[in-house]
Amino acid sequence: MARPIVAIIGRPNVGKSTLVNRLCQSREAIVHDQPGVTRDRSYQDGFWGDREFKLVDTGGLVFDDETEFLPEIREQANLALSEASIALLIVDGQQGLTAADEVIAAWLRHSKCEILLAVNKCESVELGLSMAGEFWRLGLGEPYPVSAIHGAGTGELLDRLISILPPKELIKDEEEPIQVAIVGRPNVGKSSLLNAICGEKRAIVSAIRGTTRDTIDTSIVREGKLWKLIDTAGIRRRKSVNYGPEFFGINRSFKAIERSDVCVLVIDALDGVTEQDQRLAGRIEEEGRACLVVVNKWDAVEKDTYTMPLMEKELRSKLYFLDWAQMLFTSALTGQRIDPIFSCASLAVEQHRRRVSTSVVNEVVYDALSWRSPPTSRGGRQGRIYYATQVASSPPSFTLFVNEPKLFGDSYRRYLERQLREGLGFEGTPLKLFWRGKQKREVEKDLKRQQNKSSD
């Protein structure tokens, strides 16, 4: 079931992101003393009692200034309100009622949302009651005193919030989109690729490095599926990045990788694989994300019949973290091989979520053992694999029960992973292998228990 959306609204530095983290019991929203840290919309899941909802953190609203990113922040807040059921206005109890709060309150009255008012930075009950009093003048109903830092008053606020959420029976089921993070170094053509995929100018494209600083979400239907494409800020080495918008954009790019179903890693065909590309590939593998490597600007490469296979071999030798990922040579400028991106990404997601029965896994493992026996230690003790089973998906994860894990070196572990891939597939997704030591008699009990279950 789709979750109703609550838009968090307020002027800069009233503690919106801190309150989001408190209400969702997380630390996902970036929090900093510098005003204006949040620019784009940031979504987090929350729940209270028997209700689930999504909180949308927005940037600090300023209506009398057109400089920097303030118009874009207002546009993002408008988009948040357009999809929300409730607008939660946050004000600063320590600063008191300001003219900016009154402007925002007047603006909110034109929205279709229910409006809830929270007075933040009320660090005690007595102080909160006195601070909240003057905010009745906004005409938005009862102000709820809260402390985002300490949690005071948040229970009462959440009680009120879920009481005005739309009834469960009125909330329609929605298809969950496949999330695709388009990642890469600055100026490799990520935004151009997004525009080519969508067939429209969805993202700003410029020769200036780092034009995209925020993540840009675009929904699109392809291959009979709903996709959410996330264009991210170009990722440079941390020591090359000054503290500021680009710094936070890169942090959000890493978060986009974490929340994606599949990553499209964009490589510049003219530059080849750089050290930063390798770091990014390693990050994707560490996060366990499915991946497709797109080599962009293929139209600018002088080529003959042998150019593509030779370049693929060279690129793969440097992207050894992602030797399991498919590779496409594309041109966002001409549209060459843009359409296959979806079929390749769809296959990668399917394999990422796939599960295989224990019996099939063990057929592959026992076949691998027949071709290459486990190593023997200097003391003459040989490694033994009793059985294996898939314990998770996204990414596919397997536990191998063995007599002693340290008897299996890196070389043999890589061999087993290759054999699992050859026998089971899993193209486009990393595999996780866990080696667990177990006594033989414990294994026999496990196997007997499994046999009894299958016969029931």
UniProtKB/Swiss-Prot annotation:
Keyword Ion transport listed: no
KH-like domain ranges (all copies): 354-439
Keyword GTP-binding appears in the UniProt entry: yes
InterPro entries registered for this protein in UniProt: AAA+_ATPase (IPR003593), G_ENGA (IPR031166), GTP-bd (IPR006073), GTPase_Der (IPR016484), KH_dom-like (IPR032859), KH_dom-like_a/b (IPR015946), P-loop_NTPase (IPR027417), Small_GTP-bd (IPR005225)
Coiled-coil spans in chain: none
PROSITE patterns: G_ENGA
Residues covered by the EngA-type G domain: 4-169, 178-353
CDD domains from the UniProt entry: EngA1, EngA2
Xref: SUPFAM superfamilies: P-loop containing nucleoside triphosphate hydrolases
Matching Pfam families: KH_dom-like, MMR_HSR1
Gene Ontology molecular functions: ATP hydrolysis activity; GTP binding; ribosome binding
UniProt-listed GO biological process terms: ribosome biogenesis
Residue positions binding GTP 2: 184-191, 231-235, 296-299
Amino-acid positions noted as binding GTP 1 in the UniProt annotation, renumbered to this chain: 10-17, 57-61, 120-123
Keywords attached to this entry: GTP-binding, Nucleotide-binding, Repeat, Ribosome biogenesis
Role this protein plays: GTPase that plays an essential role in the late steps of ribosome biogenesis.
Stored NCBIfam families: GTPase_EngA, small_GTP
Subunit structure: Associates with the 50S ribosomal subunit.
Family, similarity comment: Belongs to the TRAFAC class TrmE-Era-EngA-EngB-Septin-like GTPase superfamily. EngA (Der) GTPase family.
Name this protein carries in UniProt: GTPase Der
Organism: Prochlorococcus marinus (strain SARG / CCMP1375 / SS120)
